[in-house]
Amino acid sequence: MIEYLTNKFLNSKQTLLEKIVQIHDKKINITKLAKTLIEKSDCTKIDNTIGQKLLIKATYANDLDLVKALHDKGVKLGTKDLLGRTSLHHAIKAGAGKDLIEFLIDNAGIDINACDKSGSTLMHWAVNSHHIPAIKLLQTKKADYFTPDYLGQTPLKLAEYYGHDDVIELLAENSSAGYYV
């Protein structure tokens, strides 16, 4: 596969990694291909624009090894997209595993209570996605779940709206301020 892509795009002005991020064929394992290229490459740093695209693909693929490889090559894990969302937002939305989310929390330098452009915090995203491991991790990092988004919805109100009784119970039992909706 790598030989095919290398030969196909050899005369292109784009790098092979730039071409890889443009592939949307589900039959091709993009993250495995990118990891192989990064490991075999002699480059010490990856362009952040390309790195961000690969990082988002890696979070949706729940590929902690690729996220770590990109981080080692200088890709900034806390970079925000046009909507103010980071790789951590995308990992939570994608239902990524606890280890990947924990790695991003510990290494991305992201304010755990920062809002995206809709006013949603990471806790809003975790509750909205019904991502219990992410909610628990965010709680250990003292994430706020009483802050409303721009529509006035707190994570607790979202849990109630979606009927996530287990989330309501989890947030209420771990709340030092009590349960206010």
UniProtKB/Swiss-Prot annotation:
Database matches in Pfam families: Ank_2
The name this protein goes by in its record: Putative ankyrin repeat protein RBE_0150
PROSITE patterns linked to this entry: ANK_REP_REGION
Keywords from the UniProt entry: ANK repeat, Repeat
ANK repeat residue intervals: 50-79, 83-114, 118-147, 151-180
Lineage of origin: Bacteria, Pseudomonadati, Pseudomonadota, Alphaproteobacteria, Rickettsiales
Keyword Repeat: yes
